[in-house]
Amino acid sequence: KIMLSEKVFAYNIGNGELLWQHDGAGIPNISLAIADGRVFFLKDDVEDEEREQARAAVQAEIDGGNYVPEREQKLSEKERDVRRVVCLEAESGREIWNRPYDLTGCGGTKLGVAYEDGRLLFFGHYSNHDEGPFNKGNLNWRRITVLQSESGSLLWSKPLNYRRRPTIVGDTIYIEPRRCDLATGEIQKRTHPITGESVDWEFL
């Protein structure tokens, strides 16, 4: 089971003084990311009206080409995983922005957050070896969603067939056994050493 919290807080490590605290419901411990003087995390306190707004926002992104839909789009509203994405100022705890977002397919109870170069990644913390389902292409529902950290607006969201939790190195996301571009989510290619064809970059 996922570990959930009801507060995010900061202490002065020099004297133990509580600097600030932010209350919330259903904050996954694995959703916290700190970078560039900001704290990012998820909350599970979205109202019905906000769920509708999040669904409409996804449809607009689908129409705009930034969100690649998959079978999770056929789920009912109650089955969809809509969370509140929150950005705080690390020094003061002041809220900079928050927005409800449909993160269906990004991991559910295993949903984690990472930061790199002004981008927030949402993905599943999977740590199993699903070679059989992977080889059959049955892990496509494992989605990665990337938001701009400054505003929370969507950069891209795609269902990617990956086995384990992604790792970011520079401008590349390693999604076992492939890798994709951090800025676009496009699977990177290489030249096959024997055939000379352009194929997906893969490792065993």
Please place each PLM-identified region on the residue numbering.
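Secretory-pathway ectodomains
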Residues: 1-204
